[in-house]
Amino acid sequence: MMKKLILLPFAFITIQLNAQIQMPKASPLGKIEQKVGLADISISYSRPGKKNREVFGEVVPFGETWRLGANENTKITTSENLIFGKDTLKVGTYGLYAKPSKEMWELYFYTESTNWGMPEKWDDSKVALRLKSNIINLNTIVENLTISIDNLQFDAATISISWDKTRVEFPFQLDTKSKVLASIKK
């Protein structure tokens, strides 16, 4: 009985110490906040690493929809409509998903953005916008998944996704000029 009473405080101390240990995530959180023209755009995602693996075709199978990251849903939020060619992504927050193949990718902006990873059941009616991009083969390896907003202009930019030796780009435009003119007229 005495041994149990002596061990009890040590058990509590051990539990307390374990509760205070913080470990880094295998796929750390990444977040971009970018002003493009008058639009505020943010993308939050987890950044898995290559870790000496073959990423596309193995870790991320070709022809299957992927959650574009790890852990929580990858999300994009925009305060202005984004115009991708003839298609418009309306103001809001979307889950981002991709379907890579050997030569091109499809990128999906999904209206449901609160789930963890892939939706339990994919619903095409929740795809707000579907885009395609040819693959750009890189000469150097990008160790961690990287999503960026590049080629910034007054009324345009590019969402770029890079990992391993692959890059895809999705250029978009904004209606900045008419908003500025309307502001001047006020």
What are these regions (language model features)?
Residues 57-73:
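Aromatic- and Gly/Pro-rich amphipathic surface segment
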Residues 1-22:
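Bacterial Sec-dependent N-terminal signal peptides
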Residues 15-16, 90, 155:
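Generic detector of short, well-ordered, non-transmembrane alpha-helical segments enriched
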